[in-house]
Swiss-Prot record:
Cofactor binding mode and count: Binds 2 heme b groups non-covalently.
Cofactor(s) this protein cannot do without: heme b
Topology within the bilayer: Multi-pass membrane protein
Keyword Iron: yes
UniProt-annotated binding residues for heme b b566: 97, 196
Protein name: Cytochrome b
Protein origin, superkingdom: Eukaryota
Length: 378
C-alpha cells in the first residue's frame, strides 16, 4: 500500500499534498480555515447542483420555482437553507483566513497570496450573482444598483451596463446569464484553488513565529488531518444550527416578496458579507470615486507584500502592529454595521471616517509601525 501511495501517478500527488506533506509542528488552529474553505466549496457545489435541477432562470417563474423547491421537492427546504447559509459560513471562513494571513505575514508568499486574491474576487462575483437568482425584491434591486455602478466608467460605461444586462434593464437575459455564470464559476474556483495549493506547497506553510521551520516539520497525516477533521465537525454543527434553527437570520425579509420593478425597497443593501465594501462605496459622494474605492478596498490587498517594512514576518512579537491589526478588524466590523444602516446622519460621517481609517491603516500606519519596530529592536 505504501508503494502504491508513493509511486502511483495519481496517488502520489494526493500523498504529497495531504499525507506526507512536511508541515511546521507549531501551526495553530488558525491554519484550519484553508481546509474548511475547501469543505465549504464542495458543500456549495453539491447543494447548488441539486437546486439547479429544479430552478428555472426565467423572470416569470424564478421566484415560484424557489417556492416549489422549498414546498414540494423532497428535502428541498434544507438544501436551499444549507446553500444560502453555507455562503455566509464560506465568507466567515474566507475573511478569517485572510485575517490570519495578514497577521502572520503569509502574504509574503506572493504567488499564493495573489491567487488567493483572485479566488476572493471570483467568490464575491459568484455570491453576488447567486443572490440575484431567487428574484425577490432585494435580488432585483441589488442587481440593478450594483450593475449600474459600471456606468460610472467614462466613455464605455453605459454600453457596458447594457451589455451586462442584455437589454435596457435587468430582465430575463440578465437572470439567464447570471445563472449560467453562477453555475460555472465554482468549478473555476476549484481549478484556481488547485493552483493556490500548488504555489503553497512549493514554499511550504508559514507558522506563527514567521521563522523558517525546515528543521522542525511533521507529516500532515495523521497530526493535522485529525485537527482539520475537528474543525470540519464544528463547521458542520454551526451550519446545521444556522440552517435549522434560524435559517433567515442573515437574509433580508424583502427577498420574500417577488421582484417588482415599480416598487423600490426603502433601503437597498447586499448580503452582510459585502456590507463593508458597500459602506466604502457609499462614503464617497462622487459615483466614479465610489466605484474606484469599492474595487480598491479589495485590490489593496495585492499591495500588502510591497508595503511590508518590518524585519519580522509575523505580528506575534510586534505589539504596535498588533494594535493596528485589531483596529483594522474593528474598523471593518464598523463598516459592516454602517453598510446596513440608511444613508443619513450620523451614519454618513461615521462611514467616511471608517473608510479613511481602513485605507490609512493598510497604506500608511502598518508600514510606519514596521519601521518604528525595526528602530526599537536595534
Amino acid at each position: 500500500m505504501t508503494h502504491t501511495r508513493k509511486f502511483h501517478p495519481l496517488f502520489k500527488i494526493i500523498n504529497k499534498s495531504f499525507i506526507d506533506l512536511p508541515t511546521p509542528s507549531n501551526i495553530s488552529t488558525w491554519w484550519n480555515f484553508g481546509s474548511l474553505l475547501g469543505a465549504c466549496l464542495i458543500t456549495q457545489i453539491l447543494t447548488g447542483l441539486f437546486l439547479a435541477m429544479h430552478y428555472t432562470p426565467d423572470t416569470m417563474t424564478a421566484f415560484s420555482s424557489m417556492s416549489h423547491i422549498c414546498r414540494d421537492v423532497n428535502y428541498g427546504w434544507i438544501i436551499r437553507q444549507l446553500h444560502s447559509n453555507g455562503a455566509s459560513i464560506f465568507f466567515l471562513c474566507l475573511y478569517t483566513h485572510i485575517g490570519r494571513n495578514i497577521y502572520y505575514g503569509s502574504y509574503l508568499y506572493s504567488e499564493t497570496w495573489n491567487t488567493g486574491i483572485m479566488l476572493l474576487l471570483i467568490t464575491m462575483a459568484t455570491a453576488f450573482m447567486g443572490y440575484v437568482l431567487p428574484w425577490g425584491q432585494m435580488s432585483f434591486w441589488g442587481a440593478t444598483v450594483i450593475t449600474n455602478l459600471f456606468s460610472a466608467i467614462p466613455y464605455i460605461g453605459t454600453n457596458l451596463v447594457e451589455w451586462i444586462w442584455g437589454g435596457f434593464s435587468v430582465d430575463k437575459a440578465t437572470l439567464n446569464r447570471f445563472f449560467a455564470f453562477h453555475f460555472i464559476l465554482p468549478f473555476t474556483m476549484v481549478a484556481l484553488a488547485g493552483v493556490h495549493l500548488t504555489f503553497l506547497h512549493e514554499t511550504g506553510s508559514n507558522n506563527p513565529l514567521g521563522l523558517t521551520s525546515d528543521s522542525d516539520k511533521i507529516p500532515f497525516h495523521p497530526y493535522y488531518t485529525i485537527k482539520d477533521f475537528l474543525g470540519l465537525l464544528i463547521l458542520i454543527l454551526l451550519l446545521l444550527l444556522l440552517a435549522l434553527l434560524s435559517p433567515d437570520m442573515l437574509g433580508d425579509p424583502d427577498n420574500y416578496m417577488p421582484a417588482d420593478p415599480l416598487n423600490t425597497p426603502l433601503h437597498i443593501k447586499p448580503e452582510w458579507y459585502f456590507l463593508f465594501a458597500y459602506a466604502i462605496l457609499r462614503s464617497v459622494p462622487n459615483k466614479l470615486g465610489g466605484v474606484l474605492a469599492l474595487f480598491l478596498s479589495i485590490l489593496i490587498l495585492g499591495l500588502m507584500p510591497l508595503l511590508h517594512t518590518s524585519k519580522h514576518r509575523s505580528m506575534m512579537l510586534r505589539p504596535l502592529s498588533q494594535v493596528l491589526f485589531w483596529t483594522l478588524t474593528m474598523d471593518l466590523l464598523t463598516l459592516t454595521w454602517i453598510g446596513s444602516q440608511p444613508v443619513e446622519h450620523p451614519y454618513i460621517i461615521i462611514g467616511q471616517m471608517a473608510s479613511i481609517l481602513y485605507f490609512s491603516i493598510i497604506l500608511a500606519f502598518l508600514p510606519i509601525a514596521g519601521m518604528i519596530e525595526n528602530y526599537l529592536i536595534k
